Every structure is written in structure tokens, then in C-alpha cells.
């Protein structure tokens, strides 16, 4: 009987995602033994420093890939929004699972709507993407960095350190914290991050479990997320850049929305593509080129300094 080892971060959300993948695999392959290999990553160790200042979200990924390289694990489970624009040589994204609610949520103990927040309200978020869009929509808000897992952030809110938080709906739903969601922010206000709400499974290209993992792939989610990633690849963006890209499918038609700007919200570029499904990758490239024509490279250059 084969044993498949899943490398995962130790946070409650990461463990939930790894367990979810394990359950899906067991449904498809009842004879398979699945074990979790929890790993502390640099992103977890540096839990109080904004990601944009310490090298971006790849800090959540690197140690999991090392575990696979050293044969301490067979696959790794990630939040797709944490996965960098390129994978190390010899690794593949074998599956992307069905997307949970991809939008951002307002979480507050006193206010039910973003528009109800008073001038100068303290809003916790560490995401440059969220800061860009919130500052553009409500420049009066005081946007404050917050790190830590979902429960840690909720505790900080409950202690009175913040008037509201902006968190991913998907994480709250998966951790059964749905009741904390006061408002789901529409795309007009806060366009989601690339891959937000989707779980990805990475493995070595020569893994004996590659075919097992590929059975979990959800085509519609995968094509949307991969198209979002094309935009970022063409722009050569990463976690340290305020960028939002979101693709949706309606039948065989894809709508691809994108934004890039400055975290003060004073400059925000946007572009939308509507295309046939088979044209998705080209649409991603066109989207990136349109943003570049508007001046995206100037913004990217500022954040790479």
C-alpha cells in the first residue's frame, strides 16, 4: 500500500486545506495512505513583519518545496494566492481545486458595511492590493498592517486594536468563521488577488503520484487561475506589488479584470478583457500589455526599488 506525504504549513487554515486534499485523495484512491508533514516556514517565523518588506509570499512556499526535493514529502498544498509567478525547475502545479468564494470580506464588531466606517477608522490589512483599492475607494481610512493567522487577526480586532479587518472570504468560510463576515466586498471595490480562494497542489514533475493528483484538478477554476497568473507573469509582478487580477467563466466566455496601482490609491490602472475560453492565455497577455501601455511598468519599478 502506498503512502503519500503532504507538506503543509502549520496554520489552522493550511492544515484545513491539506486535510481537504487528503480527504479528496482518499475518496478517489481508498487504498492510499495519506500523511501530513507540517512544516514551519519563514513566512510563519517572521509573522509580525509585512510580507512586502521580507520578500513576499514565496516565504510560505520555499520550505515545502525543499521538503519535496529532499524526499521528506511527496506533494505540497498551497493557497494559490501564495504561489509565485514561476515554480522552481522540476516542479509542477498538478491540480487546482474548485474555488471557494474568491472575494474579500469586511469583518467588524460595530459596522456592517464599508460605507458605515467613520472617517479615520482603523482597518487592518497587510495586503498591498487591498490597501491600493481601499485607499482609492475610501482615502480617509487609516490602513494598518496586520499579520498572523485568521484567529490571531480576529483576536486583535476583538481586543479593540482595529475598527475593522479585510480578510479573504475563503479563509473565514473554511475555518467556519462565516458569521464574522459583515460585508462581501464587490469586485468594483476590491478585486480579488490572483488565485484567491483556490487551493493548489504542487509536486515534482517526476512524482509517481502526479496522475493521482491530477484527478483533483477542477478545469474551470484552473483555467481562470492560470489566466490570472499569465497577467502577473507578463508583468513580472509578485507579492510586493499592488496588483489584482480576477477571471470568471460564463459558459465558454471568460471575463478577465485587472488593476495595478499605488498603495495610496491615488493612481490605479485597470483593464478588462472578454474572450472565448480557448483564447484565455492570449487574453492574459493582452491584459498585461494594456496595463503596460497605461504605465504599469512605472508603478512596478517603484515597488522594486
UniProtKB/Swiss-Prot annotation:
Its cofactor is dipyrromethane. PROSITE patterns: PORPHOBILINOGEN_DEAM. GO terms for cellular component: cytoplasm. Its EC number is 2.5.1.61. Disulfide bonds: none annotated. One of its GO terms (biological process) is protoporphyrinogen IX biosynthetic process. The modification S-(dipyrrolylmethanemethyl)cysteine is found at residue 239. One of its GO terms (molecular function) is hydroxymethylbilane synthase activity. Pfam families: Porphobil_deam (PF01379), Porphobil_deamC (PF03900). The keyword Transferase applies. The porphobilinogen subunits are added to the dipyrromethane group. HAMAP family: Porphobil_deam. Monomer. This is Porphobilinogen deaminase. It comes from Dichelobacter nodosus (strain VCS1703A).
